[in-house]
């Protein structure tokens, strides 16, 4: 049947194709034939847009090995056989799947039975262990509470108890070292001791008191150990270059909480350093520095100023160094009175050198090296007293007292030396030299005074102290000098005495003018010079008036009274006498320098000489003016007075100026 159908299709297709080829004559027949329409529709189909058709044709092409009538007729059978084979293969595969699913179903059923069995058993076990679960839950709850309590206990112990390592650090051995960990443990003890006070305000007072007592005992043990160690460390600080370790500094910081132990440790430090400073001072005096540099101070004992200065300089440096050591030791101490502690210990350290220092300076002073050296030594002692007291305050009383005593001793012997020198001046007063200049004793004394004042000016003693010393030195030297000069000139004439005193006072004044704090003395000397200058001025004016013949005339004019009558009628005041005097006066006016008293040539100061000449000339002009006024006065009955005194006072003053 399949084959018959294939033939019909093939014939119909062929006929249809032939009909199409016949042209328009067969158009109407083709339109009425269904097969033709289908063929026509198939032929008009565009296969490139129908993907399903293309796929079907591709699948269909596999059935054709060759395009023959036989294969076309058997096409349907081939397709059906192919379809049957596929279905049989599908059935075979699904049979295997079915068998697997049945096996799985059996396994699932077995598992279900097992689970059911386990559920039953669990239910039975649950019913049997209900009490155990309740007990377990209760125990877990209690375990959590106990764990919390354990944590609280651990926190409490951590807060209020030390570890075994910390306990070992604090108790330690007597000779064991102190490290940074020790101070951490000690700080921990102090912190616990402070924190435990919180417990005293709760219902844990008993525990709080026990812990506080335990910490207090630990603190005392730790402080005692720290004190012993610090004492031992201080005893080792016997080298000149003292190196204070950071641990010892921390120890002093910790010991400040125990004032007694703190004080004992400072005393131990001071004792160790005192012996070191004394030994260092003796070595500096007798052995010198390392390798002989610097040389021993005793090598300069022949030079008193350097000898004393080197000793004081060494002590000044040692005092400053010891203060620095103490400041390094106590730099972390915060209690009040640290500065006082430093000064007190420095005083104790330096006290040991007082005796050897005092003995040596006394030897120098008592040997009386001379007033100038004594004064320099006195100023040196005063300077170092001021300098050292500025470093350590007034607490280093022993050393400062020793220096002050030596200062007073040197000052006393210095003024004794000046007084002795002054007394020698008065014991043997020299006569003034022929040139009326300063005596050799005066020159020597002024040279001594100049050296003393020069050393005083170059000293670094405070200003107030220097001024007070100046006043005393000047009084001790100048007053005897003035007295000596006065006694020495007492047997001279008026002009000679005035000249000698002016020269002597002038030398004193020029000496003092070079130094400070002498203003008051300079004023006193100037007043005395001016007093003697007045004498010389009067002597010079009298000398001129006498030499020109105006002295008698001037004195008579001054003493004349109206009731005595006219001057022209008085003896030696007639016109002839006056004209003769004017002749001498004219000679004086032409060469005034020829009429100078000899003493003016002995004056040391040209300025003083000019002053005397100038002021004496003014006196002469004044005297001439009075005589001129009297002669010109008609009451005195001089005839033709212009011919007697032909020069007016203004002309005379102009000529002499």
From Swiss-Prot:
Coiled-coil intervals: none
Clinical disorder: Congenital disorder of glycosylation 2L: A multisystem disorder caused by a defect in glycoprotein biosynthesis and characterized by under-glycosylated serum glycoproteins. Congenital disorders of glycosylation result in a wide variety of clinical features, such as defects in the nervous system development, psychomotor retardation, dysmorphic features, hypotonia, coagulation disorders, and immunodeficiency. The broad spectrum of features reflects the critical role of N-glycoproteins during embryonic development, differentiation, and maintenance of cell functions. Shaheen syndrome: An autosomal recessive syndrome characterized by severe intellectual disability, hypohidrosis, dental enamel hypoplasia, and hyperkeratosis of the palms and soles. Some may develop mild microcephaly.
Function per UniProt: Required for normal Golgi function.
Protein transport keyword on record: yes
Alphabetically ordered keywords of this record: Congenital disorder of glycosylation, Disease variant, Golgi apparatus, Intellectual disability, Membrane, Protein transport, Transport
Complex formation: Component of the conserved oligomeric Golgi complex which is composed of eight different subunits and is required for normal Golgi morphology and localization.
Organism this protein belongs to: Homo sapiens
Primary site of residence: Golgi
Any single GO CC term annotated in Swiss-Prot or TrEMBL for this entry: Golgi transport complex
InterPro entries: COG6 (IPR010490), COG6_C (IPR048369), COG6_N (IPR048368)
Places the protein is found: Golgi apparatus membrane
GO biological process, one term: Golgi organization
Bilayer topology annotation: Peripheral membrane protein
UniProt family annotation: Belongs to the COG6 family.
Protein name: Conserved oligomeric Golgi complex subunit 6
């Amino acid at each position: 049947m399949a084959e018959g159908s294939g033939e019909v299709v093939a014939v119909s297709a062929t006929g249809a194709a032939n009909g199409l080829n016949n042209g328009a004559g067969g158009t109407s027949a083709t339109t009425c034939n269904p097969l033709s329409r289908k063929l026509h529709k198939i032929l008009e189909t565009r296969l490139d847009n129908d993907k399903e058709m293309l796929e079907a044709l591709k699948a269909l092409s596999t059935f054709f090995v060759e395009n023959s009538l036989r294969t076309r007729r058997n096409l349907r059978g081939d397709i059906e056989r192919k379809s049957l084979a596929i279905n049989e293969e599908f059935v075979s595969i699904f049979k295997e799947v079915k068998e697997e699913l049945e096996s799985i179903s059996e396994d699932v059923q077995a598992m279900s039975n097992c689970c059911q069995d386990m559920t039953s058993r669990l239910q039975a076990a649950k019913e049997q262990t209900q009490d155990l679960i309740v007990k377990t839950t209760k125990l877990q709850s209690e375990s959590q509470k106990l764990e919390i309590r354990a944590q609280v206990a651990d926190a409490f112990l951590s807060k209020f108890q030390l570890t075994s390592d910390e306990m070992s650090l604090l108790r330690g051995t007597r000779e064991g070292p102190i490290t940074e960990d020790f101070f951490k443990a000690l700080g921990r003890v102090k912190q616990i001791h402070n924190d435990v006070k919180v417990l005293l305000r709760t219902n844990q007072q008993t525990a709080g008191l026990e812990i506080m007592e335990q910490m207090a005992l630990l603190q005392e043990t730790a402080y005692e150990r720290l004190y012993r160690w610090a004492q031992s460390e201080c005893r080792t600080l016997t080298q000149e270059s003292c190196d204070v370790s950071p641990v010892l500094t921390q120890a002093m910081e910790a010991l400040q909480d125990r004032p007694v132990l703190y004080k004992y440790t400072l005393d131990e430090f001071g004792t160790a350093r005192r012996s070191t400073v004394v030994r260092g001072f003796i070595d500096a005096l007798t052995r010198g520095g390392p390798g002989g540099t610097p040389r021993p101070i005793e090598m300069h004992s022949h030079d008193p100023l350097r000898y004393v200065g080197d000793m004081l300089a060494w002590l000044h440096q040692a005092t400053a160094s010891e203060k620095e050591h103490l400041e390094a030791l106590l730099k972390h101490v915060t209690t009040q009175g640290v500065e006082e502690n430093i000064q007190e210990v420095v005083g104790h350290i330096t006290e040991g050198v007082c005796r050897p220092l005092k003995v040596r300076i006394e030897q120098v002073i008592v040997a009386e090296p001379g007033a100038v050296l004594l004064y320099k030594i006195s100023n040196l002692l005063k300077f170092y007293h001021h300098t050292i007291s500025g470093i350590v305050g007034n607490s280093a009383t022993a050393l400062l007292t020793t220096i002050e005593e030596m200062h007073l001793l040197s000052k006393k012997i210095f003024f004794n030396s000046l007084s002795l020198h002054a007394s020698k001046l008065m014991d043997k007063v020299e006569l003034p030299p022929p040139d009326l200049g300063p005596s050799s004793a005066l020159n020597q004394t002024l040279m001594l005074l100049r050296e003393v004042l020069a050393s005083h000016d170059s000293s670094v003693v405070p200003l107030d102290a220097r001024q007070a010393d100046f006043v005393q030195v000047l009084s001790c030297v100048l007053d005897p000098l003035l007295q000596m000069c006065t006694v020495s000139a007492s047997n001279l004439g008026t002009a000679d005495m005035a000249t000698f005193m002016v020269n002597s006072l002038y030398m004193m004044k020029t000496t003092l003018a070079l130094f400070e704090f002498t203003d008051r003395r300079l004023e006193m000397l100037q007043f005395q010079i001016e007093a003697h200058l007045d004498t010389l001025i009067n002597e010079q004016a009298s000398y001129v008036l006498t030499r020109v013949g105006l002295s008698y005339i001037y004195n008579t004019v001054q003493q004349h009274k109206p009731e005595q009558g006219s001057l022209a009628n008085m003896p030696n005041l007639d016109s002839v006498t006056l004209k003769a005097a004017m002749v001498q006066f004219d000679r004086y006016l032409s060469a005034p320098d020829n009429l100078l008293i000899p003493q003016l040539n002995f004056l040391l100061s040209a300025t003083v000489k000019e002053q005397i000449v100038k002021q004496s000339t003014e006196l002469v002009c004044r005297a001439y003016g009075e005589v001129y006024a009297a002669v010109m006065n008609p009451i005195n009955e001089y005839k033709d007075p212009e011919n007697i005194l032909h020069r007016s006072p203004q002309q005379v003053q102009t000529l002499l100026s």
